[in-house]
């Protein structure tokens, strides 16, 4: 009986191995080839997809465990008016795993190499959702001549670790874009494939690395220096996501930090999207598009 059980377990393992192998091979099938480009930055290959050809270039970065696929329709809409680029951070989607600590400084270094190797023309309007807001801010501070506008979508704040420290007292989901079990129903087959790539082992390791070094990333962003006076749109959620603990409304703390982002520039504005939670780009895409184009237009007027 024990021998039969061992054989059964062995067959089950072999089946899982075959199923995994078949799934991996399916991802290499030409029908799943993405429309963008694979670009070598020397020590790894990264994926980027740019649409449209009008300046400036809108460059979008997502939150931890987020998916570029969830921004695809927004990118397509924007491309009618402006060049728009989506990319996969190291370990996400079709990009190779990254090297070193997964801090914002590392991410921006890789992104800058990608921009140069892919010969993506500036200037840039940077869009950052959640943790991607760190990328946008750090890049703007480090390369001020190339960045003409920012759009921060329910962005992380460098002080959130301390101002939301009460969350350590309870079990809770990380303050990042959560990965759902199923892709959104309105995703195309291509977008679903992109989405599920972020459930792979390499993507999970990338997400864990970014969470591990979140504190270092926050420090880097806070001390990256001021950005030049440019159009900055701050979009924040209207539907609360955080509890009240020890008599403190953590959601109010979050909103206060969103308002604090207005200090980045004298040419900034704040929009609370009343009917949206954290994933504003999914729940209110038109508001995101409107504000990105507003930043684009203001950046053009400033350049005159």
Give the location of each predicted region.
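Active-site loop/oxyanion-hole signature of alpha/beta-hydrolase fold enzymes
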Residues: 49, 86-127
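Alpha/beta-hydrolase
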Residues: 60-62, 87-89, 153, 236, ...
